[in-house]
Swiss-Prot record:
SUPFAM superfamilies: Ribosomal protein S5 domain 2-like (SSF54211). Belongs to the universal ribosomal protein uS9 family. This is Small ribosomal subunit protein uS9. One of its GO terms (cellular component) is cytosolic small ribosomal subunit. InterPro entries: Ribosomal_Su5_D2-typ_SF, Ribosomal_uS9, Ribosomal_uS9_bac/plastid, Ribosomal_uS9_CS, Ribsml_uS5_D2-typ_fold_subgr. The keyword Ribosomal protein applies. The gene is rpsI. HAMAP family: Ribosomal_uS9_B. Pfam families: Ribosomal_S9. One of its GO terms (biological process) is translation. The keyword NAD does not apply. GO terms for molecular function: RNA binding; structural constituent of ribosome.
């Protein structure tokens, strides 16, 4: 039953399989929360979001107290700005490992994933901005015979 495709114009007419056409269902628990995990460098963020007033709690503290630098707060709020849902979700998260920059990136990744579980229609906008992709860059390991990962010990000819 395979259709023969002779040109790119014919490719548009071919219907996608039924499994790909199905609408994704939102994943929410009994309290109406969506859960996701985000990672960046050595940091791991566990994120729960639910409809609310825009309150963000990190490790039991307010966002402004945990991340004093405005740049890091901006990074965390980017998924809400892209999806036009600022002040519509309450976020509760726990972050472990890494430094503040890695933790902010992990939070952004986790919030983006949780938003797509809450409302699958947000996925294309978040994916276009690159928020759904786990950043693979990590610290390069130190090598023996060298001072650091790439820095060599000082060399003297004589």
């Amino acid at each position: 039953m395979a259709e023969e495709i002779k040109s790119f114009e014919d490719l548009k007419d071919v219907a996608a399989p039924a499994a790909l056409q199905q609408k994704r269902e939102p994943k929410r628990d009994a309290q109406g929360r969506s859960y996701a995990t985000g990672r960046r460098k050595d940091a791991v963020a566990r994120v729960w979001i639910k409809a609310g007033s825009g309150r963000i709690t990190v490790n039991g503290r307010e966002l402004e107290n945990y991340f004093p630098r405005p740049v890091l707060r901006m990074v965390i709020n980017q998924p809400f700005v892209v999806t036009n849902t600022t002040n519509q979700f309450d976020v509760v998260c726990t972050v472990t490992g890494g430094g503040l920059s890695g933790q902010a990136g992990a939070l952004r990744h986790g919030i983006s994933r949780a938003l797509t579980y809450f409302d699958p229609d947000m996925r294309p906008a978040l994916k276009a901005e690159g928020f759904m992709t786990r950043d693979p860059r990590t610290v390069e390991r130190k090598k023996y015979g060298r001072a650091k990962a790439r820095r060599s010990f000082q060399f003297s000819k004589r």
